[in-house]
């Protein structure tokens, strides 16, 4: 599970084997984990992350979208 980025309490990472899903990023904090599709950006799931933290994570996904997408494709060789 490679970590791509850390910002504040958030860790942005991929799981190594999720072949049937579009480009996405998992975002974890101490409360749980949420997942965002990267292009276009959309919340794909949330397990325990407080709503205000989900919004903050989404803002960070927008801010780092280019990096996250590049790292996703680099890792998954697409």
Which positions does each model-derived feature cover?
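Negatively charged, low-complexity tracts enriched in Asp/Glu with abundant Ser/Thr
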Residues: 1-9
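Alpha-helical interaction segments
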Residues: 4, 15, 26, 54, ...
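A short, structured beta-strand/loop element
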Residues: 15-51
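Feature detects long, helix-prone N-terminal segments enriched in hydrophobes
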Residues: 11-13
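C-terminal structural segments of small proteins and small subunits
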Residues: 49-78
């Amino acid at each position: 599970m490679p970590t791509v980025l850390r910002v504040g309490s958030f860790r942005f990472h991929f799981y190594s084997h999720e072949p049937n899903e579009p480009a996405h990023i998992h975002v974890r904090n101490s409360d749980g984990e949420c997942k965002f599709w990267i292009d276009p950006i959309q919340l794909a799931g949330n397990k325990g992350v407080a709503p205000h933290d989900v919004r903050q994570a989404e803002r960070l996904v927008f801010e780092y979208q280019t990096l996250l997408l590049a790292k996703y494709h680099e890792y998954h060789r697409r």
